[in-house]
Amino acid sequence: MASIASGPAQRPLAAPPEWCRNPCNSRKRGTVIFADVLANPAALLPFVLIGFAAQLVDGALGMAFGTISSTLLVGMGVPPRVASAGVHAVETFTTGVSAISHVAHRNVHWPLFFRLVVPGVIGGVLGAYVISNVSAETARPVVLGYLLAIGLYLLWRGITHRHTEREPRIVEPLGLIGGFMDAAGGGGWGPIVTSNLLVQGASPRITVGTVNTAEFFLTLVISATFLFTIGLEAVSTATLGLLIGGVLAAPLGAVAAKRMAADRMLVLVGIVLIITSGLGLAKLLS
């Protein structure tokens, strides 16, 4: 007897991502990574050293962990959105330890903190959504060129001892833009926010401590957004190594920020901005 068709054939639904199909797979992924590390612990060491060095600079100068780490991961072939998600997952822990250290050393100005953290979180959520769905690389050359100019200016001010401390006026827009670029580019909160507050005359020690403390809440929200949009794709041996090195170095950065002279800090911030922005521009132009 011939079968009777009940209607037009329906197209099968697209299969959901692996981590959504089976929630246990996220646990399996973590198990595989730890098994790989135990089998070859030497593979973890380079990432531990990079995380330690990057966080030491970030804790003392308020920038560079995200930029250095993301550049490294992308250079090794990791997709930009996965690299950004992995770095922010690591920074959730490193910025938490760094924030506690800066608060303990009285490097935080709380009115400035609250003016930064709310727009920063809003910008971070928008940036995480953008990089998870579209490319945000169009604005990258402009941002890098701007940060290179800021680096040269801060270097000049530090060398010529022209830093006069005063209350910064433009804060909330910096938080919004810094949060957006940090999520969309895998790094940018420190370079954009710290450098522009220093240009306005804010105290280097207070600026670094406040920006780093606000960054904890920013990375927490960005990481949650990435987890919702791309899952646990960012978990890897590299992120585990960056996490270990970063957490070990986080308390030391706050001590360095407290003891470093303002002019010397401006010079070092300028040098870091010039190097990271210059390398980024060279890579884009090559």
Briefly describe each language-model feature range:
Residues S3-I4, P8, P12-G59, A64-P80, ...:
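Juxtamembrane transmembrane-helix boundary motif
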Residues Q55, S84-T92, V208-F216, L273:
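Transmembrane helix-bundle signature of multi-pass membrane transporters/permeases
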Residues I206-T225, T237:
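Hydrophobic alpha-helical transmembrane segments of multi-pass integral membrane proteins
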Residues S98, W189, N212, L218-T219, ...:
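Secondary-structure boundary/capping motif
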Residues G75, A85-S101:
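Early transmembrane hairpin of solute transport permeases
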Residues T92-T95, L148-G151, F216-L220, I274-S277:
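Small-residue-rich packing faces within the transmembrane alpha-helices of Major Facilitator Superfamily
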